[in-house]
Each structure stands twice: as structure tokens, then as C-alpha cells.
Amino acid sequence: MTDEPTAHSSTPLSSTPGHLAPDDVGLVTPLDFVLPRPFTFKHGQPLDGLTLRYETYGTLNATRDHAVLICHALSGNHHAAGWHSPTDKKPGWWNNLIGPGKAVDTRRFFVICANVPGGCSGSTGPSSTNPATGEPYGLRFPALTILDMVRAQKLLLDHLGVAELHTVVGGSMGGMTALLFAIEFPNFTRRLLAMATTAREGAQAIAFNEVGRQAIMQDPGWNNGDYPPNGGPRVGLAIARMMAHITYLSDASMDRKFGRRTIQSREKSPQLSAELALSDPQLSTLNAQPAAAAADFNLQFEVESYLRHQGQTFINRFDANSYLYITRALDQFDLDHAYGSLEQAFAPVLAESLIVGFTSDWLFPPEQNRQIAQALLRAGKRTSYAELSTDLGHDSFLLESEELYALIRGFLERTPPATTADFAI
């Protein structure tokens, strides 16, 4: 399924259900772009029929130069804003940022967000059916890199008729994608906005990813990557998500939200009981305890229930093999090594850049974001850096923040572009 370059995937606001705000993009329909030719991944493996699922918000203008590409993080997808149906419980993952009158104003910009190749939300990935076998690709899916994500999304933009990107925007893995987009397609990219990200995956982040991968791969349900749809290493994937989710928070935010509050019993907390009703039999091991155990290893603390709930909900929307592929792509991201130095990596960049770090982010700490901005400045690029004070951790870029919204709006709408002399780090 494809669309015309000027397609508007939102319904008119007058036809949206009553619970939607006037600044929502409304009801949106995901679209599919099937690449007309085989896509060759960085490591040389070709794939026929690579599909990218995406959404657009707003309308492409006549000059086709006001597009904003939104790049999602590890567990994100193409559904960045709006609602798929009137009964949806939640809007897109960045709905607070994208819409008419919002920081990324869909009255001014044509906004695109695509699920990356290797994902599991409609784009071709390990869980997709291999037409040659009629079975999921599993580990026969080509090795994946951030560069593959960038090149595939550029083909989508070409298909949509985008002549020039006004801005490429992303946080976390999306920030890596945005950086590489500005490097690989300098004449196409006017502005770069990367948040809560890094120029190279460090040892600690790789270590967290490896623990998650081992949780998946040691689950008997993984079966070397061959498992049926809605099956597989569900316990392992839940544990991987529980562990990773901790890295997205901060000590202060967790202490404020949970502290050492305990759970006396499920009966005393109906809401909690509903959250922990693990209907999947495979997940019963998360709550299991031998009857004769001298110590109590059942749920005691609210933070435990929160993490188990995170694991439970994640396995219902994400594929374990996609988790393996995408985290490995993150591990291999290293601009310094790939280009010889960060200055050499950023040498082709023509875009004006805004890099944003968050003080409590311990997954990609502010100093890693600052290093990106400093390298861009050393390479002679128009660059600004902002460090926002927050105790919400790595996920700060996804959460409500008027300070962040004002920063993004100002960067997107500023004219003319700044010069390197306008900013100090």
C-alpha cells in the first residue's frame, strides 16, 4: 500500500471523537511502502520486498521542502501521533509534541515517522514471513545496522516526493539515526535535532543490552530464533524489558514514584491485581515460588509490580528477535570508529544542529551529548547545545516538558539559521 506525495493521513478534526483535543492530528491510518527493488543491507545481504510502515501528519507543500522526519527509539514505532481508532486508550508515542499548534506544528510541517527495518510493527523484520519458505525469517533476516535504517528511510522520503528535509529529529536510537542521516545525506538535510543520544554505544549500554539478549536467548522458547507467532521466549523478553526499563528512569524518579512502598496482598489492590493477572501461562514463572520456601519471593514492593507490568505489556507488542537485532545494531554504532574521528564523521554535515542532553540521563549521559555538539563545532558546523535539568532520566525526551517544547519549536521555526559563533558550550 502506497500513497501520493501530498497525502494527508489525518482525518479532519471535525470528524474526530470527542475525547481528542483540538491540537491532536486526529485519526491516522498507517501506510506501507514496499521498496520496488531489492534492498542491500550494509553487510551485503539483499532482501526483496522490504516494507516500511509509516504515518504522515500534515500536507507536503508545493516546494516539497518542509518535511520533518521523526526517528523512533528502540521500542518505538511509526505511530508517533494521533489515534488509530476512537477506542484507542493511548495516542502515538510523541503525541504531546506533534500536532497543529504544537512544537512540531503540522500546520507548518509535513511530518513523517516510519518503523525501522528489522522492527515488528509492520516493517519487514525477523518476524515477517520469508516468501521463499512461508515461515518467519527468524535469524535468517539480514544483519542490521543504524545505517540500514537511515538508507531505507531515505528511500521512503524519495517515494513521498520530499525534495529536502527541513529537520530530522530523534531521541535515543532515533538520535543516532538523525546524526547519521545528516552525515549520509548532507545536501538533503537542513536541520538536525538529536536528543538523549550518543555518538557511540558505550560499554555500559552494551552490557545492559547483552543482559537482555541473554535473557531472551536462554529462554527455551527462543529455539535459536525459530518460534511461532505469539509464542517464543516470552519470559526472556519480559525480563529483558524489565531490566532495560530501569535504565530509562532515574533513582530520583523511581524513589518518588515508588519509594519502599509495599504490597500487602493483591486483594487489597484491585488495580494492581488486574495489572498482574498474567494470563500468559509462560509468564507464571515471574510470580512462582516453591510452596516450602522459607523466604517470601512473591511481590512485596510496588516497584516490583511496576516492572512486571512493563514486561507483561511489552511482550504483547514486541518481537524477541527484533529486540536482538536492534540492540545489536545499537551496540555497533560508533561514529568515531566508522569515520576515523567525530570531526571527520561530521565533516560532510551541512545541517544546522541542536543537540539536547538531560542531567539525569544515565544511559546516554549529558556529557555524551555534549561531546557530539563539541565535535560538530570543531568541524565548523552551525551547532547549539542545550542541557535540561530534570530528574526523569533517559525518557525525559518523551515526557511532558514545556521547556523542551519551547526549545524544539524555536529551533524548527528559527530563521535565518544561526552561525557557529552564536552558541557556546
Segment roles from a protein language model:
Residues E55, T59-N130:
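N-terminal cap/lid subdomain of alpha/beta-hydrolase-fold enzymes
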Residues A338-E343, P365-L376:
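Short alpha-helix in the alpha/beta-hydrolase fold that links the catalytic acid
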Residues G134-R140, L147-T167:
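Conserved acidic catalytic loop of the alpha/beta-hydrolase fold
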Residues L377-I425:
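Catalytic active-site module of serine/aspartate enzymes centered on a nucleophile-bearing elbow/loop
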Residues M1-H8, P12-I70, H84:
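Catalytic-loop region of hydrolases
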